[in-house]
Amino acid sequence: MAIIMTESSYERRVKALYEKQIHMEALEAKFIKKVFKFNSNLLDVKEAASRHQRKVGKLQKVLMERREELDKRVSFIEELDRELEATKLHNLAMKDWFKQQKMLAKQRKNEIMESIHTLSKTTRTYINQEALPARVKGVTVLRGDKRDQLIPFDLKATDVEGLDSLCQHLESLNVDVAQWQQLISLAMDMAMESRAPTTPPKEADNCKSIIEIDLTSPMSHT
Protein backbone atom coordinates (compact mmCIF):
# COMPACT_ATOMS: atom_id res chain seq x y z
CA MET A 1 0.00 0.00 0.00
CA ALA A 2 1.59 3.23 -1.23
CA ILE A 3 2.14 6.03 1.10
CA ILE A 4 0.93 9.39 -0.29
CA MET A 5 2.93 12.31 1.07
CA THR A 6 1.50 15.76 0.68
CA GLU A 7 3.48 18.98 1.02
CA SER A 8 2.72 20.85 4.13
CA SER A 9 2.12 24.54 4.06
CA TYR A 10 5.48 25.08 5.75
CA GLU A 11 7.39 23.32 3.03
CA ARG A 12 5.56 25.29 0.43
CA ARG A 13 6.52 28.50 2.14
CA VAL A 14 10.17 27.42 2.42
CA LYS A 15 10.22 26.43 -1.20
CA ALA A 16 8.64 29.69 -2.22
CA LEU A 17 11.16 31.64 -0.14
CA TYR A 18 14.01 29.68 -1.68
CA GLU A 19 12.76 30.32 -5.19
CA LYS A 20 12.23 33.93 -4.33
CA GLN A 21 15.78 34.15 -2.98
CA ILE A 22 17.14 32.59 -6.14
CA HIS A 23 15.13 35.05 -8.19
CA MET A 24 16.37 37.96 -6.06
CA GLU A 25 19.94 36.77 -6.41
CA ALA A 26 19.48 36.55 -10.15
CA LEU A 27 18.01 40.05 -10.18
CA GLU A 28 20.87 41.26 -7.96
CA ALA A 29 23.45 39.69 -10.26
CA LYS A 30 21.72 41.24 -13.23
CA PHE A 31 21.58 44.60 -11.46
CA ILE A 32 25.25 44.37 -10.47
CA LYS A 33 26.11 43.56 -14.06
CA LYS A 34 24.15 46.59 -15.24
CA VAL A 35 25.79 48.77 -12.59
CA PHE A 36 29.22 47.52 -13.64
CA LYS A 37 28.40 48.19 -17.27
CA PHE A 38 27.06 51.62 -16.34
CA ASN A 39 30.21 52.41 -14.35
CA SER A 40 32.34 51.14 -17.21
CA ASN A 41 30.42 53.28 -19.67
CA LEU A 42 30.60 56.21 -17.28
CA LEU A 43 34.38 55.79 -17.04
CA ASP A 44 34.62 55.68 -20.83
CA VAL A 45 32.51 58.80 -21.02
CA LYS A 46 34.72 60.52 -18.42
CA GLU A 47 37.87 59.52 -20.32
CA ALA A 48 36.33 60.69 -23.59
CA ALA A 49 35.29 63.93 -21.91
CA SER A 50 38.82 64.31 -20.53
CA ARG A 51 40.33 63.71 -23.96
CA HIS A 52 37.88 66.17 -25.46
CA GLN A 53 38.76 68.70 -22.78
CA ARG A 54 42.45 68.28 -23.54
CA LYS A 55 41.77 68.73 -27.25
CA VAL A 56 39.68 71.80 -26.48
CA GLY A 57 42.53 73.14 -24.33
CA LYS A 58 45.03 72.56 -27.14
CA LEU A 59 42.69 74.19 -29.64
CA GLN A 60 42.19 77.16 -27.34
CA LYS A 61 45.97 77.48 -26.97
CA VAL A 62 46.42 77.30 -30.74
CA LEU A 63 43.63 79.84 -31.24
CA MET A 64 45.23 82.17 -28.69
CA GLU A 65 48.62 81.83 -30.41
CA ARG A 66 47.02 82.43 -33.80
CA ARG A 67 45.16 85.44 -32.43
CA GLU A 68 48.38 86.87 -30.98
CA GLU A 69 50.14 86.22 -34.28
CA LEU A 70 47.29 87.86 -36.17
CA ASP A 71 47.40 90.87 -33.84
CA LYS A 72 51.15 91.16 -34.47
CA ARG A 73 50.60 90.97 -38.21
CA VAL A 74 47.86 93.58 -38.04
CA SER A 75 50.16 95.84 -35.99
CA PHE A 76 52.98 95.24 -38.46
CA ILE A 77 50.74 96.04 -41.43
CA GLU A 78 49.48 99.20 -39.71
CA GLU A 79 53.06 100.26 -38.97
CA LEU A 80 54.01 99.45 -42.56
CA ASP A 81 51.10 101.55 -43.82
CA ARG A 82 52.22 104.46 -41.64
CA GLU A 83 55.79 104.15 -42.90
CA LEU A 84 54.56 103.87 -46.48
CA GLU A 85 52.41 106.97 -46.08
CA ALA A 86 55.33 108.83 -44.50
CA THR A 87 57.57 107.70 -47.38
CA LYS A 88 55.00 108.88 -49.92
CA LEU A 89 54.79 112.28 -48.23
CA HIS A 90 58.59 112.46 -48.08
CA ASN A 91 58.89 111.51 -51.75
CA LEU A 92 56.31 114.13 -52.69
CA ALA A 93 58.17 116.73 -50.67
CA MET A 94 61.48 115.70 -52.26
CA LYS A 95 59.88 115.75 -55.70
CA ASP A 96 58.60 119.27 -55.10
CA TRP A 97 62.02 120.28 -53.74
CA PHE A 98 63.86 118.85 -56.75
CA LYS A 99 61.35 120.49 -59.06
CA GLN A 100 61.91 123.82 -57.33
CA GLN A 101 65.69 123.36 -57.40
CA LYS A 102 65.55 122.46 -61.08
CA MET A 103 63.46 125.54 -61.77
CA LEU A 104 65.86 127.73 -59.77
CA ALA A 105 68.85 126.16 -61.51
CA LYS A 106 67.26 126.78 -64.91
CA GLN A 107 66.47 130.36 -63.90
CA ARG A 108 70.04 130.86 -62.66
CA LYS A 109 71.43 129.32 -65.85
CA ASN A 110 69.32 131.64 -67.98
CA GLU A 111 70.45 134.63 -65.91
CA ILE A 112 74.10 133.59 -66.21
CA MET A 113 73.78 133.00 -69.95
CA GLU A 114 72.13 136.39 -70.37
CA SER A 115 74.89 138.02 -68.32
CA ILE A 116 77.56 136.17 -70.32
CA HIS A 117 75.96 137.31 -73.56
CA THR A 118 75.76 140.92 -72.35
CA LEU A 119 79.34 140.96 -71.02
CA SER A 120 80.61 139.23 -74.15
CA LYS A 121 79.13 142.01 -76.28
CA THR A 122 80.30 144.73 -73.87
CA THR A 123 83.90 143.49 -73.68
CA ARG A 124 83.87 142.06 -77.22
CA THR A 125 85.29 138.86 -75.79
CA TYR A 126 84.30 135.39 -76.92
CA ILE A 127 85.01 132.41 -74.67
CA ASN A 128 85.53 128.83 -75.85
CA GLN A 129 83.09 127.03 -73.55
CA GLU A 130 84.49 123.62 -74.49
CA ALA A 131 87.89 124.49 -72.99
CA LEU A 132 86.42 125.39 -69.60
CA PRO A 133 86.89 124.76 -66.74
CA ALA A 134 90.43 123.42 -67.35
CA ARG A 135 91.55 126.29 -69.58
CA VAL A 136 90.55 129.89 -70.21
CA LYS A 137 90.54 130.13 -73.97
CA GLY A 138 89.07 132.72 -76.28
CA VAL A 139 89.65 135.99 -78.06
CA THR A 140 89.06 139.67 -77.31
CA VAL A 141 88.35 141.96 -80.24
CA LEU A 142 89.59 145.56 -80.13
CA ARG A 143 87.84 147.91 -82.50
CA GLY A 144 90.19 149.94 -84.65
CA ASP A 145 89.75 152.77 -87.10
CA LYS A 146 90.90 150.68 -90.02
CA ARG A 147 90.57 147.14 -88.77
CA ASP A 148 89.87 145.24 -85.60
CA GLN A 149 92.68 143.78 -83.51
CA LEU A 150 92.33 140.23 -82.21
CA ILE A 151 93.86 139.35 -78.85
CA PRO A 152 93.66 135.57 -78.43
CA PHE A 153 94.36 133.93 -75.09
CA ASP A 154 94.75 130.33 -73.95
CA LEU A 155 95.77 129.81 -70.32
CA LYS A 156 95.32 127.18 -67.64
CA ALA A 157 92.54 128.09 -65.25
CA THR A 158 95.03 127.72 -62.41
CA ASP A 159 97.58 130.05 -64.04
CA VAL A 160 96.74 133.03 -61.85
CA GLU A 161 99.89 134.93 -62.76
CA GLY A 162 99.27 134.46 -66.46
CA LEU A 163 95.69 135.64 -66.09
CA ASP A 164 96.93 138.63 -64.10
CA SER A 165 99.36 139.55 -66.87
CA LEU A 166 96.60 139.19 -69.46
CA CYS A 167 94.34 141.48 -67.41
CA GLN A 168 97.07 144.09 -67.18
CA HIS A 169 97.61 143.89 -70.93
CA LEU A 170 93.89 144.25 -71.65
CA GLU A 171 93.64 147.14 -69.20
CA SER A 172 96.44 148.90 -71.06
CA LEU A 173 94.31 148.57 -74.20
CA ASN A 174 91.36 150.25 -72.46
CA VAL A 175 89.40 147.04 -71.96
CA ASP A 176 87.09 147.06 -68.93
CA VAL A 177 89.00 144.44 -66.93
CA ALA A 178 86.36 144.22 -64.20
CA GLN A 179 83.71 143.20 -66.72
CA TRP A 180 86.20 140.91 -68.50
CA GLN A 181 86.96 139.13 -65.22
CA GLN A 182 83.25 138.88 -64.46
CA LEU A 183 82.69 137.31 -67.89
CA ILE A 184 85.42 134.72 -67.26
CA SER A 185 84.04 133.97 -63.79
CA LEU A 186 80.48 133.48 -65.06
CA ALA A 187 81.65 131.32 -67.97
CA MET A 188 83.72 129.24 -65.55
CA ASP A 189 80.75 128.93 -63.21
CA MET A 190 78.51 127.81 -66.07
CA ALA A 191 81.05 125.22 -67.22
CA MET A 192 81.49 123.78 -63.75
CA GLU A 193 77.73 123.55 -63.17
CA SER A 194 77.13 121.84 -66.52
CA ARG A 195 79.83 119.25 -65.78
CA ALA A 196 78.83 118.69 -62.14
CA PRO A 197 77.10 115.38 -61.27
CA THR A 198 73.35 115.41 -60.64
CA THR A 199 73.92 114.41 -57.01
CA PRO A 200 77.25 115.94 -55.98
CA PRO A 201 79.31 114.15 -53.31
CA LYS A 202 79.10 115.42 -49.77
CA GLU A 203 82.73 116.58 -49.89
CA ALA A 204 81.82 118.97 -52.69
CA ASP A 205 80.31 121.31 -50.11
CA ASN A 206 83.82 122.13 -48.92
CA CYS A 207 85.22 122.77 -52.42
CA LYS A 208 85.77 126.33 -53.57
CA SER A 209 85.11 127.49 -57.09
CA ILE A 210 87.96 128.72 -59.26
CA ILE A 211 86.09 132.01 -59.68
CA GLU A 212 86.85 132.84 -56.05
CA ILE A 213 90.53 133.34 -56.96
CA ASP A 214 91.52 136.97 -57.09
CA LEU A 215 92.86 137.30 -60.65
CA THR A 216 94.59 140.56 -59.80
CA SER A 217 96.68 139.18 -56.91
CA PRO A 218 100.33 138.46 -57.81
CA MET A 219 101.27 134.77 -57.61
CA SER A 220 104.22 132.80 -58.95
CA HIS A 221 103.79 130.31 -61.83
CA THR A 222 103.20 126.70 -60.81
UniProtKB/Swiss-Prot annotation:
Residues 51-86 form a coiled coil. GO terms for biological process: cell division; chromosome segregation; meiotic metaphase chromosome alignment; meiotic spindle organization; mitotic metaphase chromosome alignment. Disruption phenotype: Die as late third-instar larvae. Mitotic neuroblasts in larval brains exhibit high levels of aneuploidy: chromosome alignment is compromised during spindle formation, many chromosomes display persistent mono-orientation which leads to aneuploidy during anaphase. Chromosome behavior is also disrupted during both meiotic divisions in spermatocytes: the entire chromosome complement often moves to only one spindle pole. It comes from Drosophila melanogaster. This is Kinetochore protein Spc25. It is found in: Nucleus; Chromosome, Centromere, Kinetochore. Keywords: Cell cycle, Cell division, Centromere, Chromosome, Coiled coil, Kinetochore, Meiosis, Mitosis, Nucleus. Acts as a component of the essential kinetochore-associated Ndc80 complex, which is required for chromosome segregation and spindle checkpoint activity during meiosis and mitosis. Required for kinetochore integrity and the organization of stable microtubule binding sites in the outer plate of the kinetochore. Participates in SAC signaling that responds specifically to disruptions in spindle microtubule dynamics. The NDC80 complex synergistically enhances the affinity of the SKA1 complex for microtubules and may allow the NDC80 complex to track depolymerizing microtubules. Belongs to the SPC25 family. The keyword Ion transport does not apply. Component of the Ndc80 complex, which is composed of Ndc80, Nuf2 and Spc25. One of its GO terms (cellular component) is kinetochore.
